[in-house]
UniProtKB/Swiss-Prot annotation:
It is a multi-pass membrane protein. It catalyses: K(+)(in) + H(+)(in) = K(+)(out) + H(+)(out). The chain crosses the membrane at residues 10-30, 48-68, 94-114, 133-153, 159-179, 210-230, 242-262, 270-290, 331-351, 363-383, 388-408, 413-433. This is Probable potassium transport system protein Kup 1. Keywords: Cell inner membrane, Cell membrane, Ion transport, Membrane, Potassium, Potassium transport, Symport, Transmembrane, Transmembrane helix, Transport. Signal peptide: none annotated. Pfam families: K_trans, K_trans_C.
Length: 624
């Protein structure tokens, strides 16, 4: 398969994008976990053992070996997984639809917290230079984040190729710092033995269990491995993890532990304290660059997730800007960028330190991992045809581990973790209302219309006033399968262009559609045709470009020039009515009506890439 190809360039690229988040966890994870308990050899070995086995079981085994199997034709992520289940026509689709949109909301919440905790933790290294610099940590971090979000509209095409080498420098740096400490105190290598993890949990009891909330911070970012399969492929990601990221992370964690065994007072900032004093400033700079790259990767992943949601019809057609002519995956979503910016800055200003942010971080990622586990477990039974016993045994273990971490993370809900969860519920509700509203619109306003060919006969189509030399392209939306824009045009004008093409697009439950499966055409009359254009959920919808290719391939029965044709789109005005109940709640109808009014006219034209000077919007009125 194409997505399974391997090159060192792809592996380096994966290093810069996929592992930025999990790769910067050493800045704060061990510090947060060990805070509040005695810093002694027994506790340090226990915590290091838990870190080691968490990375091995959750990331190395569960994600890279099992979850990676659940790709959708080379694409990963929770929405791609939902599309896979729809494509395979599995049962319980409505249930997994709810699960997937809630998971997508959780990832958006994570996109606010990750830049905040990453950048703040890096800039906190200034405190190692002088205590007088601590008051400047938050202002400097805020300036960096403002610049980061402000530059999103420019794209990363010019500097994106540097991400891999820069993160490689980061991993090599933290590995060397760890090795220097391990050589002096090799006793920490005993932590590889799982006995130390078990003994620590038994000895600490309930307090040790809740420390798993800190341990979980070392695997946050692991969910990005699955989501980024489509960008780099499975094998480059696996190579980067097993040969670079995993060894370097373990060396650094163990190095921090080795230093704390002999210098427990350095728990205030164990990451920076393992470096020699002369290297503090260069390390702060390298760490800041690494956290900015990690934040950029999370922001880009959120943009990509939003595009998938729009194309799959899960949310309104919000503006999506292509920032690169060469790479379709490089996009900018202004409204999502603004939401992430406001959320990230609010977290920074409210929590102020990485320690405080850590008390809110992780629970959203934990829930998302749990949801992915459940969906992949069902895919293993219904799609892969694994035996029920094997699925229960394997995924039962995964779910047990994730539930254990979730229980340990529950206290984070009241210390700030509620924000991404509430946001996830809000986003899921918007997606649900949008999807349900479109289905109601289709079933009650468009599905019951008579077939166009019958209407053309009733109207005695050939006797209508003809507009010679005029070609019109009528675009129908996802909820309209009957050519509503064309019918409204006939009703209003009682005349027809010489050539009429009714275009409907369908986003299939696969990432990319082959050219041979792109077009379906049905001729309703000599000069009236209905064309269905198929897209994948990772593609960019461009109606004029697709029509131009169709004309060049002589797919259409008549010739017309796309550059001079007129495009027609229908703009429905939805009104909520208290007299009749269409959706679950009146305010849900109001929400859907608001979304339709604000994301129809101009955005439809932008979404389809139609020329403004040759596009006519036809209004219609619907009462829910």
């Amino acid at each position: 398969m194409k997505k399974n190809r391997f090159t060192y360039g792809l592996a380096l690229g994966a290093l810069g994008v996929v592992f930025g988040d999990i790769g910067t966890s050493p800045l704060y994870a061990l510090k947060v976990t060990l805070s509040g308990i005695p810093i002694n050899q027994f506790n340090i070995l226990g915590v290091l053992s838990l870190i080691f086995w968490s990375l091995i079981i959750i990331v190395s085994f569960k994600y890279l070996m099992i979850i990676f199997r659940a790709d959708n034709d080379g694409e990963g992520g929770i929405l791609a997984l939902l599309a896979l289940m729809k494509h395979k026509s599995t049962k319980y689709q409505p249930l997994f639809y709810i699960v997937a949109i809630f998971g997508a909301g959780l990832l958006l919440g994570d996109g606010m917290l990750t830049p905040a905790i990453s950048v703040v933790s890096a800039v906190e290294g200034l405190g190692t230079l002088s205590d007088k610099l601590y008051p400047y940590v938050l202002p400097i971090a805020s300036v960096i984040l403002v610049l980061l979000f402000s530059l999103q509209a420019k794209g990363t095409a010019r500097i994106g190729y540097l991400f891999g080498p820069l993160i490689l420098i980061w991993f090599i740096t933290i590995a060397i710092l760890g090795i220097l400490q391990i050589v002096e105190h090799p006793v920490v290598l005993q932590a590889i033995n799982p006995y130390h993890a078990i003994a620590f949990l038994v000895d600490e009891g309930l307090r040790g269990y809740f420390l798993l909330g800190g341990i979980f911070l070392v695997v946050t970012g692991g969910e990005a491995l699955f989501a980024d399969i489509g960008h780099f492929g499975k094998n480059p990601i696996r190579f980067s993890w097993f040969f670079i990221a995993l060894p370097c992370l373990l060396l650094n964690y163990f190095g921090q532990g080795a230093n704390l065994i002999v210098r427990p007072e350095e728990i205030s900032n164990p990451f920076f304290m393992i470096a020699p004093p002369w290297f503090y400033l260069p390390l702060i700079i390298i760490a800041t660059v690494a956290t900015v790259i990690a934040s950029q990767a999370v922001i880009s992943a959120t943009f990509s997730l939003t595009k998938q949601a729009v194309l799959l019809g899960l949310c309104p057609k919000i503006p999506i800007v292509q920032t690169s002519m060469l790479h379709s995956g490089q996009i900018y979503v202004p409204q999502i960028n603004f939401i992430l910016f406001i959320g990230t800055m609010a977290f920074c200003l409210a929590f102020k330190t990485s320690d405080n942010l850590a008390h809110a971080y992780g629970i959203a990622v934990n829930l998302e991992m749990l949801l992915v586990d459940a969906m992949v477990a069902y895919a293993a039974v219904s799609i892969w045809r694994w035996s029920t016993f094997n699925v229960i045994f394997l995924f039962g273990l995964f779910l047990l581990i994730d539930l254990a971490f979730l229980g340990a993370n529950t206290h984070k809900f009241i210390t700030g973790g509620w924000v991404p969860i509430v946001l996830a519920f809000f986003i899921a509700f918007i997606m649900y209302s949008w999807r349900y509203g479109l289905e109601y619109l289709r079933d009650n306003f468009y599905m019951n219309k008579e077939d166009i060919s019958k209407i053309l006969k009733q109207l005695q189509y050939k006797s209508l006033n003809q507009l010679p030399g005029v070609s019109a392209i009528f675009i129908t939306d996802v909820y309209d399968k009957s050519g509503g824009s064309f019918l409204h045009f006939l009703k209003l004008n009682r005349s027809v262009p010489e050539n009429v093409l009714i275009v409907n697009y369908i986003v299939d439950n696969i990432p990319y559609v082959h050219y041979s499966q792109r077009y379906e055409i049905v001729c309703l009359d000599e000069k009236v045709c209905k064309l269905v254009i198929h897209y994948g959920f990772m593609e960019t919808i461009n109606i004029p470009r697709s029509l131009e290719k169709a004309c060049n391939k002589n797919i259409l029965p008549f010739k017309f020039n796309v550059d001079t044709a007129t495009f027609m789109v229908e703009i429905p005005n939805i009104m909520a009515s208290k007299e009749k109940r269409s959706l679950s709640f009146y305010w849900q109808e109001k929400l859907f009506a608001f979304l339709m009014r604000n994301y129809s006219a101009n955005l439809n034209i932008e979404f389809y890439k139609l020329p403004y000077n040759r596009t006519i919007a036809i209004g219609t009125y619907c009462i829910l």
